């Protein structure tokens, strides 16, 4: 009994710490939920710093909660003695809702209780509860931010569409189809351009919100698709201003920048490079979300080198608000883009929107000449169709298309590319990951080339478009395209998909 009495104060301290921790979390979340809306703030020099300070404070509070959890763990581990029964009963009485968990622990351990192990089990369960609460809060914040971003995108789209209508500019939707002229009342440029300028500032602020949350290293794997959509939308709006900014009366300092403030040209490059660097850091994390995006569609899944690719465990909450938003942002005239997709290049990054009936609707590619092997990166779905984030085939390249429900499909293939040498390819269909007993095989080479103008830097580049008409029909689960080449970069006479080449798109087009 003396031992139990000695532990009374320590047990009480432990319970008080738990209560305080949960109380502080509830208080912080409530404060964030009621934080002031900065979207209508004055657009002066103080606006961004105040907004950034709020975002910084939100990050600090999450870190503070994690510190409290860590401190609580240390407290428990340093106050272990032999008074299990009193500790157990006190917890049941003072921590409603957690009791069943501890009852289960008690049932598993039986009468021979190891108090140290018991306390560690307690704190592990409490940590799980608190971390889940924080993750749920973070998830909700992401969805709120993305919904706010969607409203801003809608407003920007409506304003710019009116401007395009006034100036007779043909704008395109996400399927590469022309958007009919708006039936709304025509407004003068004097009215529209200030509204477009304000809309851009609002978008910039909301995209910064999204980046702050979507690039959090602790949650990056969960929000990878949202990061993708956010990056592409933001870049699309920047692209519009680069293309039509002078006509929309944007000041040169906004487009070209000043000595102290970067312009949209630099922002575009920096933003794309940052976003793509997040992809490169997070390839492994991203595999955690792929399975939630693969139901019922043709997908591209490059297996890791040297082992069979296995679909990961599903993540439930990824992406719902993103799908509708992703259809809203391509507004600029696309006459200068190559056939087979609307490609915009910023330094070494490609963003491509493909026409209807493609295997995928959007792609992000990255190559700095040396390239990154496609085998390391998963795919994501965009608007009901998959995304292939990274392709730069310098080694032998394998594209594995997945037809999970084994629907019978008839299709042709179109490849948009820049080649250094011709490459022979194999196409085969099979029912398992390792590709045994392929049921079909065809060899083909790249042929035609066309020239197009890069709309960002006005540089003429050459792209080839090769079509393999087929038609190909299969109900197999996997479809594989393999590049056949000799891996000797020093020998120019060797055939193959060589150093310096790029693929802009590989399209399976339903017939």
From Swiss-Prot:
- Matches recorded under InterPro entries: Pest_crys_N_sf (IPR036716)
Which sequence ranges form a coiled-coil region, renumbered to this chain? Answer: none
Give the induction text.
Stimulation by changing levels of cAMP via the cell surface cAMP receptor.
Its keywords, alphabetically, are: cAMP
Signal peptide (residue range): none
Q: Which cysteines are joined by disulfide bonds?
A: none
GO MF, one example: toxin activity
Family of this protein: To D.discoideum protein M3R.
Write down what this protein is called.
Answer: cAMP-regulated M3L protein
- Organism of origin is Dictyostelium discoideum
